[in-house]
Amino acid sequence: MKKAILIIIGAVLFALVLTNLLQSEDYYNLKLEKLKQEHAIKPISSVDHSKFEILQQEFDTPQDVTEACISCHTERHREVMHSSHWNWERISYIEGRGIEASGKSNVINNFCIGAQSNEQACAKCHIGFGMSNNHFDFENARNVDCMVCHDNSEAYIKGAATAGYPDRSVNLSQVAQHVGQPTKHNCGSCHFNGGGGNNVKHGDLEQALLGCDRNVDVHMASNGMDMSCTACHTAENHQMLGKLYSVSSDNTHRATCEQCHTNTPHFDPIINRHNAKVSCQACHIPEYAKVNATKMAWYWSESGKLKDGEPYTVDDEMGNHIYTSIKGSFKWATNAKPDYMWFNGTANLYLLGDTIDEHPLILNNLHGSHDDGESKIIPVKIHVGDQIYDKVHNILIQPKLHGTQKGDSAFWIDFDWPKAAEAGMKQVGLPYSGEYGFVETVMYWPVNHMVAPKDQAVGCAECHTRNNDGRLAQLSGFYLPGRDYNKPLDFAGIFLFFASIGGVLIHAAIRILVSIKKKRYEMNVIDYENEQQI
């Protein structure tokens, strides 16, 4: 009977182990299947704008198209005019500053430096018309560009350095008759090309996402869910969910993985517990810049060199500019492994006029630590470089870069830093001493896109390792099992290990001794009984 019970228990345990090994997560993960079903059904417009008489006309100006749009969508322009896409800033709390406006109107980055004094060119990525300088009328609804976000014909493009106006080749009537929900093409026309080219800034947002496979991004893959940006970055009343921490600073209105996948997306509770301190992105985005290179360094101090009096460029073997006279020298990377840092969703930004108080100067200091209950480990792209600053006032300079003709002090035409600095600082209302130099700058770009298939996620041993090339080797101030030494804990572990072995050996020895003693006793009893019988 005893043997039968042991056999049954063993068979049950074997069956449980075998079932656990063979089960398919895809089959049992009903939450994931439900999400796939929801996003597999693409919305179909119930409106054919080509049938609207008001749109069946030849439009003289893009503002006329806007007038036609708001004649039906009577209040939508008001929503747009309260958005950061329109105002290029948001009001938020910045630690150490209080409540303050921050955005493209007053931040500095270490790519093209800043939009101020360069609006004619930078407005190519503004959702409006006519931003030729810093006196743009943000109250004029006619200048709202509906088409840049809602064109579904893929024929609408902004002109180069035309203050946000569409290219002259655009057929406004055709575009107006083919509008709908924003697509990847709409969002990508700006966000894929920030910093002056494809994938320059982010590293995880680029034109390849318009037609990639699941190895590049499981969400946006053409052979996968083919999700649009607005599937995650929803826009209730034109208030877009999501933050870009080169211009944002507070932990509100963010787009997160958990809003769809919840805090417990895995079957394994140990993996789910990681979510308390580790972001989804840290494990599920092992690489970025998977298709095209991203810019990792930009040195303005080397700009301005000419050949025979003319600007020139130098390209690498992949066709990426590694030097241009107008911008300086660059470093690029593909299939880049992210760096990692603690982040609680808040940041401090360098704003125009701030004193330089550290070297290198961090332009967007992401806050967070292990001891902060809101912080998680996130993957980031670290972009480094240098840029012009005022040696006397000890502030970064906003130079005038773009111009239309020689002699208007634009660096990209005249290649004269003192004149470009003076003109730019005059326009933003800040002093310029006449003495300039270059200071090292750093920016952190959180990596949120290019999510890999689950079988390509970061492995346990890539973080929990004592190798110097471990993914979290540079993060300190906390105990990471498998990576760190802790003498009391290590001693306790070693003691318990050997104590366990010792306990097993002692227990075995006692069992053996008891068994021997028992046998001797039984033998003595048998001998005694035999003697009695004799």
State what each model feature region is.
Residues 487-497:
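N-terminal membrane-entry
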Residues 148-152, 189, 279-289, 462:
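Alpha-helical scaffold segments in carbohydrate-active enzymes
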Residues 71, 320, 324-462, 466-467:
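Soluble extramembrane regions of membrane proteins in the secretory/endomembrane system
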